[in-house]
């Protein structure tokens, strides 16, 4: 048998984007599309990955066994359009052995949710796969333009994300946590610096700003 050497992580992104299990035929089609392997050797390559403990073959299905924690979270979340609490995600990953190292179940495992192209915080302690965000790129520009206008009108160096959200009909068409995801990961391109520590969701117009709390906003409005 010829066992072609292929990158052990070759399927990781595929699982993160499509979930598990994946039908063997889809894997057969995918592998030659991302590496220079000759078609007759694809089955050998798949068998070799299974022998190395990278994947598990069951009937005609392929399951991952060596994903990074965040890839494993994405793999689970693709099947849950409404999102899941972090503990449920951890239990599903560990129960299915999708990850090369177990995800903490006694506390939030930040490493398991730190992959913004696939995962976003969708509520208090719950996460969703980004494939369920229904917003196109042009709309993201519009969202930030509105935020810029608001920041110019209210000349302060730091804002609370909720202020922008409540002040804009356009932003309110989208879920708060979707806007939060955009600001957190694309904001710096538009001059907004996000800090989500301690649930404040503060946004500064300069890097390294001091956080504001909801109380600061209310007190300022009273003066």
What are these regions (language model features)?
Residues 1-223:
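C-terminal non-catalytic scaffold/interaction domains in large multidomain proteins
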């Amino acid at each position: 048998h010829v066992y072609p050497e292929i990158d052990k992580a070759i399927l990781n992104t595929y699982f993160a984007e499509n979930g598990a299990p994946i039908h063997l035929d889809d894997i057969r089609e995918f592998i030659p599309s991302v590496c220079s392997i000759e078609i007759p050797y694809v089955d050998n390559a798949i068998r070799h990955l299974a022998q190395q403990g990278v994947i598990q073959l069951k009937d005609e299905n392929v399951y991952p066994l060596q994903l990074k924690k965040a890839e494993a979270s994405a793999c689970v979340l693709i099947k849950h359009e409404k999102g899941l609490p972090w503990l449920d995600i951890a239990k599903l990953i560990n129960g299915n052995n999708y990850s090369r190292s177990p995800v903490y179940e006694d506390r939030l495992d930040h490493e398991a949710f730190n992959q913004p192209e696939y995962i976003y915080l969708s509520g208090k302690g719950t996460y969703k796969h980004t494939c369920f965000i229904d917003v196109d790129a042009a709309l993201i520009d519009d969202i930030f333009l509105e935020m810029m206008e608001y920041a110019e009108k209210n000349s302060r160096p730091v804002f609370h994300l909720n202020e922008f959200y409540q002040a804009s009909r356009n932003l309110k068409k989208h879920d708060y946590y979707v806007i939060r995801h955009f600001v957190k990961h694309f904001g710096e391109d538009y001059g907004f610096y996000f800090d989500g520590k301690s649930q404040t969701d503060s946004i500064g117009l300069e890097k390294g700003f001091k956080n504001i709390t909801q109380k600061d906003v209310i007190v300022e409005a009273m003066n």
